[in-house]
Amino acid sequence: MHDRLISGTEKPEDHFDRAIRPTSLADYIGQPVVREQMEIFIGAARGRGEALDHTLIFGPPGLGKTTLANIIAREMGGNLKSTSGPVLERAGDLAAMLTNLEEGDVLFIDEIHRLSPVIEEILYPAMEDYQLDIMIGEGPAARSIKLDLPPFTLVAATTRAGLLTSPLRDRFGIVQRLEFYSVEDLTHIVTRSANLMNVPMTSTGAAEVARRSRGTPRIANRLLRRVRDYAQVKGTGEVTHDMAQRALDMLNVDKDGLDTLDRRYLSMLLERFDGGPAGVEALAAAMAEDSGTLEDVIEPYLIQQGYVMRTARGRIATNMAYLQFGLTPPEPKN
């Protein structure tokens, strides 16, 4: 897997971001529809003295799903217990977490699409009836007992909502999709992070970092740290527009947030395959990559931004891709 600076997937150094994450909905920047809805749902649940309905949050990596789960727990006044789908391998793992919950607590499960069917079966009665069915003993002497659980809220996050089973998806009372952020919202996020990090920064410097962050706060904060380093060594320490531009150019992140791997993909599609259609396996072979890397790492942003179309016949470069490389788009075929 490529260690890309502009990957939305969390890296070890991103743990630093936890210190600058917002802790309340009032501080939460962007996602106005989600924020307004959650303010209403949380306020109503608190007013009734009830646990918030189970909440599913989905969207691309790096948009703030974990941050929102933390905010929900804090706003509801409960403790947050965190785990992830791949970690919950045995029924006993989940049972231990559920029985340690107190009333009003939030259980956060990241990558919930990777839960095993056995674990899902345990979750169903826990979500619906606040009950835990566990087996005592083995063989013919085995018996099932029910344990009552305190009212709690399950907050689940996934980047692949389509992989969730219908029975699991249907048990969430609240479903929120996080969208890519606007440059304006990302500029506010970068400015806030710079202030918390004591990094002097101009408004145009913040906007330049935001513009190249692919609509993703995690990438914006990562780029901010690298630009800060550059300004500290190559300048006075202040992140100006010029300083941000020079730093990001050095890091091979262009004005549209594309990196070397993105440009190599587009160049291959345009030149080797005449703009397509090209099958993903053929593209992967030409780039000496595996098709999974193309589908999961490279293509999502290029498709979302309109550089590439995915069709039944294969990948096709759009006019925007031609213009990105200074090429003349082909005439439409009749």
Curated annotation (Swiss-Prot):
Protein name: Holliday junction branch migration complex subunit RuvB
Region (Small ATPAse domain (RuvB-S)) location: 182-252
Function comment: The RuvA-RuvB-RuvC complex processes Holliday junction (HJ) DNA during genetic recombination and DNA repair, while the RuvA-RuvB complex plays an important role in the rescue of blocked DNA replication forks via replication fork reversal (RFR). RuvA specifically binds to HJ cruciform DNA, conferring on it an open structure. The RuvB hexamer acts as an ATP-dependent pump, pulling dsDNA into and through the RuvAB complex. RuvB forms 2 homohexamers on either side of HJ DNA bound by 1 or 2 RuvA tetramers; 4 subunits per hexamer contact DNA at a time.
SMART domains: AAA
Top-tier EC class: hydrolase
Positions that bind Mg(2+): T66
GO biological process terms held by the UniProt record: DNA recombination; DNA repair
Residues annotated to bind ATP: I20, R21, G62, K65, T66, T67, E128, D129, Y130, R171, Y181, R218
Organism: Acinetobacter baylyi (strain ATCC 33305 / BD413 / ADP1)
Keyword DNA repair part of the UniProt annotation: yes
Entry EC no(s): 3.6.4.-
GO cellular component: cytoplasm; Holliday junction resolvase complex
Family stated for the protein in its record: Belongs to the RuvB family.
Domain writeup: Has 3 domains, the large (RuvB-L) and small ATPase (RuvB-S) domains and the C-terminal head (RuvB-H) domain. The head domain binds DNA, while the ATPase domains jointly bind ATP, ADP or are empty depending on the state of the subunit in the translocation cycle. During a single DNA translocation step the structure of each domain remains the same, but their relative positions change.
GO MF entry, a single one: four-way junction DNA binding
Binding-site list for DNA: R310, R315
Keyword vocabulary terms for this entry: ATP-binding, Cytoplasm, DNA damage, DNA recombination, DNA repair, DNA-binding, Hydrolase, Nucleotide-binding
Taxonomic classification: Bacteria, Pseudomonadati, Pseudomonadota, Gammaproteobacteria, Moraxellales
Region (Head domain (RuvB-H)): 255-334
Highest taxon of the lineage: Bacteria
Location of the region described as Large ATPase domain (RuvB-L) in the Swiss-Prot/TrEMBL record: 1-181
InterPro entries assigned to the protein according to its UniProt record, in alphabetical order: AAA+_ATPase (IPR003593), AAA_lid_4 (IPR041445), DNA_helicase_Holl-junc_RuvB (IPR004605), P-loop_NTPase (IPR027417), RuvB-like_N (IPR008824), RuvB_C (IPR008823), WH-like_DNA-bd_sf (IPR036388), WH_DNA-bd_sf (IPR036390)
